[in-house]
Amino acid sequence: MSRASLSLLDLAGVKPYQMKKDEEYMNEEQILHFRKILNAWHEQIVEEASRTVAHMQDEVTNFPDPADRATQEEEFSLELRNRDRERKLMKKIEATLKKLDTDDFGYCDCCGEEIGIRRLEARPTADLCIDCKTLAEIREKQVAG
């Protein structure tokens, strides 16, 4: 199985966090859990970017056939678009890591409520609770539609 197909928890080598009875939300153990996940995710993206650069350098061939050259250019273009998306994701991961340092992590940017451990394990960069995210998506559809 490639690293890209692993879940974030598998990638970080952690199990789903098990809350203990009366455990405080976003305590040091939980912060460490999410820091591991975010650092592993960041590292994976850096590795993918390095592989892309190496692949593009290895694959540069001056094809005499215009169709072959166009195919290669399209493949490179797709890879570069993917890397651009990942670059933006890396910035979001880095911003989330900073939130871990300032005790802002895990709380909704809109209403201040807890985002929840399971939601954060699925999407550690989430900055809205599920209710606020749902409302934001509804508003977005109304504006677009």
Curated annotation (Swiss-Prot):
BP-aspect Gene Ontology terms: regulation of DNA-templated transcription
Compartment(s) where it occurs, according to its Swiss-Prot or TrEMBL record: Cytoplasm
Main location: cytoplasm
Pfam families with a match to the protein in the record: DksA_N, zf-dskA_traR
UniProt keyword annotations, A-Z: Cytoplasm, Metal-binding, Zinc, Zinc-finger
GO annotation, cellular component aspect: cytoplasm
Highest taxon listed in the record's lineage: Bacteria
Sequence positions that bind Zn(2+): 108, 111, 129, 132
Zinc finger residue ranges, dksA C4-type: 108-132
GO terms for MF: zinc ion binding
InterPro entries with a match to the protein in the record: DksA_N, DksA_RNA_pol-bd, DnaK_N, Znf_DskA_TraR, Znf_DskA_TraR_CS
Entry keyword annotation includes Flavoprotein: no
Assembly and oligomerization: Interacts directly with the RNA polymerase.
Function text: Transcription factor that acts by binding directly to the RNA polymerase (RNAP). Required for negative regulation of rRNA expression and positive regulation of several amino acid biosynthesis promoters. Also required for regulation of fis expression.
Family indicated by similarity: Belongs to the DksA family.
Protein name: RNA polymerase-binding transcription factor DksA
Gene source species: Haemophilus influenzae (strain ATCC 51907 / DSM 11121 / KW20 / Rd)
